[in-house]
Structures are given as structure tokens and as C-alpha cells.
Amino acid sequence: MGKGDPNKPRGKMSSYAFFVQTCREEHKKKHPDSSVNFAEFSKKCSERWKTMSAKEKSKFEDMAKSDKARYDREMKNYVPPKGDKKGKKKDPNAPKRPPSAFFLFCSEHRPKIKSEHPGLSIGDTAKKLGEMWSEQSAKDKQPYEQKAAKLKEKYEKDIAAYRAKGKGEAGKKGPGRPTGSKKKNEPEDEEEEEEEEEDEDEEEEDEDEE
């Protein structure tokens, strides 16, 4: 979010996010000294939300509506700092962030869930994937974590080369450059595919929160 800008309006919260916040406060009151197992806690909240009536949910939906109005109002008056964000993500040739172990797991299991539950919404699919992931043992998660670690390693090499190339090109535009960059782009194709899946998962996670 607005990492370096403390004046940026706080993001709007969904009805489900307000519900989770309420659950968390209830839990703190009942068990002030116990720590929360987030995977277990999220699962319980999700199950409880599904069983709630429209009337029970309406309270949280009203809270979300008023928070959205607050956010829209604040965003109208918000002026982002000069050179913020916009300049950062402009270069399409920059190496893309590698997917996490969870995103790799999602891209592998999502087609199966979609075929088993064709009418399932994007948000519910993401919830189901989150539940499946939290039920995996450390041994089951290992292959995804190893693959994610390799992709991260590759990304770190690519980003270092990309930055070095940027510095070099700032000083000179040599004709020998394109050959080197062509070699770089081939392995990046694979990474782009992974990244597309990651973006899709991130969208799903956002929808899940709403």
C-alpha cells in the first residue's frame, strides 16, 4: 500500500474484513493471553461467515459501505507525492516478482477445484485453496517451497543483471547489448507464465477479502 506515504488514505475494508476484525476482538476479550493460530482462525471465520444469515451480514455490509464512502471522500482530496509509484513499475522489461509456494500450489490445484465445483465463485475458490494449503503437511508443502526458492534465486540473479544493464546503458548504447538481452529473455518467458498465474491468484485473494 502507501509504503512511503503516511498521508495516503487507509484502504477500504470489505464486509468480510469487518467481520474478521470483530471476531479477532471477541477472541482477544475471551482469551487475552493466548496467541492466535491465523490459519485456524481464518478457517473458523470463513465457516462462520458462510452460515450467517443475510440479516446478520447486513451490519457488516453497512460498515463496509460507510468505509467505502470515507475512502472515496479521502481519495478525492489525496494528492500522491511527486514521482511516487508511477515511475517504479513502468519498465515492462524488468524481471517480475517470483510466485510464492502458495501461489504455485494454487495454480496447480485451481483447475481441479474448478472442474469439481464449476459454479464456485473466484472468492470461494480462493478460500478453498487457502483451506487446502493450511491442511498440507510440511512434507507436502516442500516441493512447492523448493520450486519457489529456485524461482526466487533466479529472480535475484535477473534483477541484479537488469540493474547492472540499466547502469551500463545509461553510460553507453553499445550495439553488442541486444544479443546479451536476448539470452536473458528466454528463461524469463517461463517466469512470465508463472507471474501471470501469480497475478491471477492475487486477484483472487483480493476478491476473497471482499
UniProtKB/Swiss-Prot annotation:
Phosphoprotein among keywords: yes
Acidic residues composition bias: residue spans: 187-210
Record-annotated disulphide pairs: C23-C45
Modified residues (N6-acetyllysine): K3, K30, K43, K90, K114, K141
Region (Disordered): 52-150, 162-210
Protein localization: Nucleus; Chromosome; Cytoplasm; Secreted
GO CC, alphabetical: chromatin; condensed chromosome; cytoplasm; extracellular space; nucleus; perinuclear region of cytoplasm
GO molecular function, one term: transcription factor binding
Record field: compositional bias (Basic and acidic residues): 52-76, 107-117, 137-150, 162-172
DNA-binding span(s): 9-79, 95-163
Entry-linked Pfam families: HMG_box (PF00505), HMG_box_2 (PF09011)
Region annotated Required for chemotactic activity, chain positions: 165-180
Keywords associated with the record: Acetylation, Chemotaxis, Chromosome, Cytoplasm, Disulfide bond, DNA recombination, DNA-binding, Immunity, Inflammatory response, Innate immunity, Nucleus, Oxidation, Phosphoprotein, Repeat, Secreted, Transcription, Transcription regulation
PTM-bearing positions, type Cysteine sulfonic acid (-SO3H): C23, C45, C106
Presence of keyword DNA repair: no
Main location as per UniProt: nucleus
Single GO biological process annotation from the record: DNA geometric change
Residues modified as Phosphoserine: S35, S100
Record's comment on post-translational modification: Reduction/oxidation of cysteine residues Cys-23, Cys-45 and Cys-106 and a possible intramolecular disulfide bond involving Cys-23 and Cys-45 give rise to different redox forms with specific functional activities in various cellular compartments: 1- fully reduced HMGB2 (HMGB2C23hC45hC106h), 2- disulfide HMGB2 (HMGB2C23-C45C106h) and 3- sulfonyl HMGB2 (HMGB2C23soC45soC106so).
InterPro entries (UniProt xref): HMG_box_dom, HMG_box_dom_sf, HMG_boxA_CS, HMGB
Domain notes: Both, HMG box 1 and HMG box 2, show antimicrobial activity.
Self-association and partners: Interacts with POU2F2, POU2F1 and POU3F1. Component of the RAG complex composed of core components RAG1 and RAG2, and associated component HMGB1 or HMGB2. Component of the SET complex, composed of at least ANP32A, APEX1, HMGB2, NME1, SET and TREX1. Directly interacts with SET. Interacts with LEF1.
UniProt family annotation: Belongs to the HMGB family.
Cited function: Multifunctional protein with various roles in different cellular compartments. May act in a redox sensitive manner. In the nucleus is an abundant chromatin-associated non-histone protein involved in transcription, chromatin remodeling and V(D)J recombination and probably other processes. Binds DNA with a preference to non-canonical DNA structures such as single-stranded DNA.
Name the record gives this protein: High mobility group protein B2
Record organism: Sus scrofa (Pig)
